[in-house]
């Protein structure tokens, strides 16, 4: 059935009947004549087929637009499949709840770097999104009376932080992402959406500041495909593989943020990288926060539930940045576990076996395979592990990509949209709450579709491509395919990952970051000395990994340079040399009588990061955080204050 679906999706009858012999084939490379170019025209093109990409594609196709989905792997292998814990929505099935409480918790969780109009939109629409998923057939776990089961998750409260722990996270045991991805993909097949599976996106096609399409390579036969479209959605996921230890799949290489960079668009807030508290020690595999939501807790070598000291109210369900830092402090102060005292234990064996089997079957299996642990009898060795990128391509709350200048403020990039982990909407700010990521996918995937449908009629003639469209992409592809330097791709990638792991970790310091920046500059220069060995065009994994390394390098450079420049601690960005959050006001004192600092004198602002791909040079700018909500009558903004759990 899957093979048949794949054939229907990408074996278009005219696929090899088209060819192109214009300027694209005149690039100054040695073997350019080898590259056959196929042209397509669509109303909309979606790059990526995870949760955000599939939800965008469904909305576009349902609205009658001729839609293409370009994905470098089969849709159900997208990294959304690895999400475990759940999706947040204030259904109120376990206790009274209100989306405004969810709004408050998300703003607080972001350490007041989130844009409150986008957070308003996401949390208000969350209940509708979950009901929509249920209608699509997503098999949520149930309570005894048949309602959707909701578990406790970190950083979430009732009554604006005054009413104790909220149970807001809708789940499918501990395999929620797997269920969501299969549900969305299955539902998408009822629409007339064309999938280009195992196609690698090389570059956006830009013309006079507008995005008019995408250049991609078919991994199966090496043909180059130019997708001409008035609308392009980036939904390519994060770049966790820029680090040595992460919960991300090997395919999480920051392709979308790299595409934006090469198109001259600045990415936002790349310095904010979330370390999940509970990756399996030594393997990096994710152990869901839902394990603590179900009653698990962390212990040190003394057997202490140490989170009671760091977050007296929320304890083990404080926000992820707080828990990861607490674990790191315990290890640094000699209270870690194991022979090297370099990790922490997650205890679940006090929970009933029935609860482990029904609510946490996936992590029980994962712990057995990757840690050799029977969770019903012994604790799981865990350590903070790179998990999520809060930064990405900057957008407004409708998914439209923004280009910011101080003179003009936020300006739309015509024809370009982004959703999911590839985007910075910014609903997560400096730190994402657990289970807001799956919500982000469906909310902003849908928002992109709604925005496009407002501005595009089915069958509308797409814009013409510039004469040299794809020329630089093919030139770079050919250069990497015939790279004959002395550094194998895997070797340079490993050096980059270890540099990022060492110099941009849970705790950061100016001298360590500065050293990391210099190391990364040297590694970036080494891209010119790469060596590839496979010269073929058919299933050339050596070539694709090299192109992915180019993308990772862009993301890594932007992350570490922005981190070195941000001289404060906020959310996931914690600096030993600047331990305090630096806002426009001192919120530890009464606001009355205080004068707001200008934007150059505080750090409650979004970074905008431009990079020159040829040299690697990074340029930084900053834009204000949006504090206004969409409708003050629905909910007012949450003023910043000292953040504690």
From Swiss-Prot:
Record-level GO BP terms: mitochondrial electron transport, succinate to ubiquinone; tricarboxylic acid cycle
Gene3D superfamilies found in the cross-reference section: FAD/NAD(P)-binding domain, Fumarate reductase/succinate dehydrogenase flavoprotein-like, C-terminal domain, succinate dehydrogenase protein domain, Succinate dehydrogenase/fumarate reductase flavoprotein, catalytic domain
Pathway as given in its UniProt record: Carbohydrate metabolism; tricarboxylic acid cycle; fumarate from succinate (eukaryal route): step 1/1
NCBIfam families named among the record's database cross-references: sdhA_forward, sdhA_frdA_Gneg
Family: Belongs to the FAD-dependent oxidoreductase 2 family. FRD/SDH subfamily.
Cofactor remark: Binds 1 FAD covalently per subunit.
Source domain of life: Eukaryota
Cellular localization per UniProt: Mitochondrion inner membrane
Catalysed conversion reaction: a ubiquinone + succinate = a ubiquinol + fumarate
Organism (species): Ascaris suum
Tele-8alpha-FAD histidine found at: 79
Protein name according to UniProt: Succinate dehydrogenase [ubiquinone] flavoprotein subunit 2, mitochondrial
The protein's Enzyme Commission number: 1.3.5.1
